[in-house]
Amino acid sequence: MSKQRPYVKFKQFQEQTGIFFRNEKLLIQAFTHSSYVNEHRKRLHEDNERLEFLGDAVLELTVSQYLFEQFPQMSEGELTKMRAAIVCEPSLVTFAHALSFGDLVLLGKGEELTGGRMRPSLLADVFEAFIGALYLDQGIEAVVQFLGKTIFPKIREGAFSHVMDYKSQLQEFVQRDGSGVLEYKILQERGPAHNKEFVSRVSLNGEELGVGVGRSKKEAEQRAAQMALAKLKQLQQG
């Protein structure tokens, strides 16, 4: 795809994603690297750096709002830690790869020869620039809708649960205290196939410590462990 004329591949991208830009120049700018601009000075091109700046802020805001609404039990520190894991470079690169953003980038010949198209920092910047372009073209709701198809489902599936790994914390707490054996059990699986919800229970030596609900078994277990951890810490404090 990267060898095609720019306008052709951007039209194909819009058809494939169902995201049609009112101002297609913004879309093209989002994928225009500074090296391309430097090699095409006779043409009116603008690189994606300003859009990246804007997209970074929009991404932080929308992810923050989603986490705030979806995880009411999380503290400010926990929310900050989770958000950092979602908007960090490795995560953005993963999202960019999933959407084949590397194929769309307009690069200078030198940057192309040195493997710039697949450079992690470049792909992360492009993802942020695309968010900035989408925001300018269609507003915050369009960004939320896009993230609802690309990032938010991964959060619900527990892709970032390692950041707030309550199961490991609970296991360490129990082992340190010498309390006994933890057991997780899925109590209920409810809802339609496309929107399932799981209820998990964690017990210590047969005694229920916490119950959690989540969009995946993993998330439900994490939430149950979080409740159990809070309960044990409270008991410890007297």
Curated annotation (Swiss-Prot):
GO terms for biological process: mRNA processing; regulation of gene expression; rRNA processing; tRNA processing. Its main location: cytoplasm. Mg(2+) binds at residues 52, 125, 128. It is found in: Cytoplasm. Residues 10-139 form the RNase III domain. Belongs to the ribonuclease III family. This is Ribonuclease 3.
